Structure formats: C-alpha cells, structure tokens
C-alpha cells in the first residue's frame, strides 16, 4: 500500500480520513453497508470512502446514490447498455443517466441495499466503477472515433484499456494508486484534432513522430479548480506508442503520490508540485521513476480543428459509417439505454460510443442501412443534425443533484438554447458550456461562451446568475477562455446572450 511521504505540512481533512482508513477498504464492507442501511453508516464511509467504488452519496437526494462508471475511450457494447438498463428499470422515474464531460456515464437512483448486486452486474459485463471519484485517476479519455477515423494517426483504444486495467487492477481496485494527493485526469489522443481537450488534463499524450516512429508527446499539470485554472504544459518528453505510455503514466503517478502536497486541498493538484519544483526538476525525478532517460518532445501533429462528430461520417472501413447523435445535455432515461442498444444491434455491430460533448456515436452502420436508421423515432429527440446552439451546448449536473451547485443548469441550458435558436439565424454552431459552480466540471473555459453559476444580487434579492467566459478555443492551437462578464442574473441571460451572439458570432435576428 502506497503511503504519502512524511511531511511537515498540516494534513488536510481528507488526508486524515484516508489515514484513518484507506478508501478502497470499503470494497470488502459493501455487503455489510447494504444490510445496515445508509442511515446507520459511518458518515466518512458513506459520504467519502464509497467514492472509491464509484458510489456517490447525494445530499440532494438522501438515500438515492449516484454511480460513476469508468468507460475507457467512452466505448460501450449493447449488452452493457442492456445490463445497465435491466438493473436501473426497478427505480422507475427515480433512475436517470448522464453522459459526462469525460465521455463516461453516471447513473442515478441507486439504493444502497442494491449496491452489491449492482457491482456484480457491472463486473459480469466487463464494466467497473472503481476509483472513479475522490483521490483517484478519473475515466481515461481518448478519441471517440479511434479505429474508425481515416485520418487518425494511432488507434488508442487498446492502450487506454490497458492503462485503465493497470491502474485499477483490471477493475478490481489497485491500492498502489488509491491514495493520490488529489484527483488526476489522463487523456490519450490518437487523432489530429485534439478531440479530448489534452490541455485540460493532469497528464495528456498527443501524437508525434520521433525518427520516423509514431509515439506521443507528453503534457502535464492541466487542471481546473475553483481557485485556479491552468493549461497543461509540455514535459518536453516523447514516448513510443506502446507499453512505455503505461510505464510513464505510472512513473508520473508515483512521483505525484509520493511528493505531492497533502496540505491545503486547493493546492494539491499535480501543477502545484510542478510549480514548486520547476519543470526541469519534475522531469528529472519522473525520468528516474521511469527508469530511463526521456527523449525530447517531437514536433506536434495535431493540426485540425476539433470536430463534434455529429451527423453521418464515412469510416475508414469501406461502406461503413459512424453516426453522431446529439443527446441534449447528455441526459438519458432507462428506456433510452435500451433504444440505443437496439439501434446499435439492428444497424451496426452492437457498439455505442460517448463523447466529451455528452453525445453518442453509433458505429459500423452500412451505407444501405443509413436511410432506415435516420428514420428511427429516437433520432427525432437525439438528432444527427441539431440546431446550432443546441449542438454546442454542454452542461454539468447543476443543482438538481449536485450540492455544490449555485444554479440549476441542464434544463436552463436546453431552454435558453432553444429560445435563442427560434429568434436567431447563426452562421455556425456556437459552443456554450454551462457549469453550476467554479469547480468547472462543465468546462466553461474551453467554450466559445462559458457560463459559470454564481449567486448575484438583483433588485435587492440574491438570485441565480452566471459569470461569462469568452474566447475558449478547442482543437488545434487550443487555449482557455477568460472571464469577460460577472454577475449576470439568469433571467437576464437570454438578452445578454442574444447580444453576444449578434456582436461576436455573426447571428442575425430572424424576420418573422
Ligand atoms: Fe467534476 C467534483 C460532476 C468533470 C472538476 N464533479 C464533482 C462532483 C463529484 C461533486 C459532488 O460530489 O457532487 C460532481 C458530481 C455531481 C453529480 O451528482 O453529478 C462532479 N465532474 C462532474 C461531471 C459529472 C460533470 C458532468 O455533468 O459531466 C463530470 C464527471 C466526469 C467523469 O466521468 O469522471 C465532471 N469535474 C469534471 C471536469 C472536466 C474534465 O475532467 O474534463 C472538471 C475540471 C477539470 C479538472 O478536474 O481539472 C471537474 N469536479 C471538479 C472539481 C474541482 C477539482 C479541483 O481540483 O478543485 C470538483 C471538486 C473537488 O474535486 O473537490 C468536482
Ligand atoms: Fe456540481 Fe459544480 Fe461540478 Fe457542476 S461544476 S457538477 S455544480 S461541482
């Protein structure tokens, strides 16, 4: 079991919690918890340690837990979707499913007494929720069209799966990496368009050739938090596209685990260690942990604008297509899971993929099947060609389920996009990201227009409002947007956004 290095700094409360009992220890107690019920559980186990199993206590819905899965590269099979739906249907309207900004699924409605069965059912279909919350490595993201995209440089699917298997002991839980100083995000891009937002991950691999061999440049330290936002910086390192990626990821995680600050929780992400040491020393220590000198970075190859993958696109396999469907703010019902599985089986080869824009992609659709697929009733709700504001709308969970939230996000995001679309003609999609609080789960800094929940004063009353970010650029030459307006009341937002869309994004008022 890995331990934090002895330190003179005062440990934060989560470090004390982990010292009292390792997070992963709840794995062996889940049957006991299920039998005693949530009210009788130790609050530390219930509200924090269960997150090591991906089970989240929701203060907003006491007794109804959320389960966050791990879906490497966002790739699912129809039998997995069916298994999730079969389990969730017992909860009726209490069940709902969200596609997350890390191309993952979160399931809601779960009762504690059902968790042992739930975890067994996940494992039976090759899924896991282990280590998906708290001080663990989050879902590892990759291009959602890996293996399909004719322009891709490297198919990252098996590498990402192998990395997840290594860091989680094939989904059973790996105590080497369950006591990091903080959460840790990893992304591996194999395409040309930076589809995974490499720049906002603690560790990202982006494709690059070294002496004719394809491998990855390495980026470190990207993160968002309520007090600081930092894009990843180059480690000036290159590794071949093989097991070296796993070795280097392990080395960086070990360096972070053993040296990262465990004091002020707001200063515990990887970038703070890099700041403290400087990138040269950090690189040196990582190289020692890696056990070999690191090659210098090679020229970057990502030179495409980011795609959203919606609509019909030919695959590199002749005669087959992938079809991206827009799922408004990523929200699904149990019935939707069944329907997506059915479409994948009927028209494709049983595969469904998720994107960091909270959408789905059906893959391997033969040319001849396209017209019938496009006429399926589900596609009237999950459109392959959504209107330009809905198309680019992403939203975090918000106050419906998240107790950090300062505002309701998802329903408001849909309503505002639809009302502005009805009034305006837009020359191109505009990416609007909503996030309910400064934790930035909805990534407002990568959006054309980012909306961050805030409490604002209007007419002497505190009301729900937002701070507005502008100028986020994704894909080639990605950079983060910056706060441009503060304290806009949500009820004034349609007017403010209308003006922004006209002035900056070429929107024109529709003549009725
Ligand atoms: Fe997040 C905490 C939801 C992506 C930064 N995030 C939370 C919690 C767990 C808080 C809580 O316990 O209620 C939220 C759960 C609410 C719920 O019931 O759904 C939550 N985060 C989400 C999701 C579901 C947003 C979404 O609607 O898609 C995303 C799940 C991703 C996944 O599948 O693992 C999600 N969170 C992100 C991202 C975006 C990303 O990874 O690209 C970020 C910013 C990037 C980053 O982390 O550097 C993000 N979440 C945070 C933070 C701030 C971290 C920090 O260093 O301060 C918190 C708060 C914390 O960890 O203390 C947080
Ligand atoms: Fe919750 Fe805030 Fe994250 Fe939204 S940004 S899911 S409100 S923690």
UniProtKB/Swiss-Prot annotation:
Enzyme Commission no: 1.7.7.1
GO molecular-function terms, A-Z: 4 iron, 4 sulfur cluster binding; ferredoxin-nitrite reductase activity; heme binding; metal ion binding
Residues annotated as binding [4Fe-4S] cluster: 396, 402, 437, 441
Domain of life per record: Bacteria
Binding site for siroheme: 441
The reaction(s) this protein catalyses: 6 oxidized [2Fe-2S]-[ferredoxin] + NH4(+) + 2 H2O = nitrite + 6 reduced [2Fe-2S]-[ferredoxin] + 8 H(+)
Keywords, ordered alphabetically: 4Fe-4S, Electron transport, Heme, Iron, Iron-sulfur, Metal-binding, Nitrate assimilation, Oxidoreductase, Transport
Keyword Protease: no
GO BP annotations listed: nitrate assimilation
Name of a matching Pfam family: NIR_SIR_ferr
Similarity remark: Belongs to the nitrite and sulfite reductase 4Fe-4S domain family.
PANTHER family named in the record: FERREDOXIN--NITRITE REDUCTASE, CHLOROPLASTIC
Record protein name field: Ferredoxin--nitrite reductase
Source species: Synechococcus elongatus (strain ATCC 33912 / PCC 7942 / FACHB-805) (Anacystis nidulans R2)
Species lineage: Bacteria, Bacillati, Cyanobacteriota, Cyanophyceae, Synechococcales
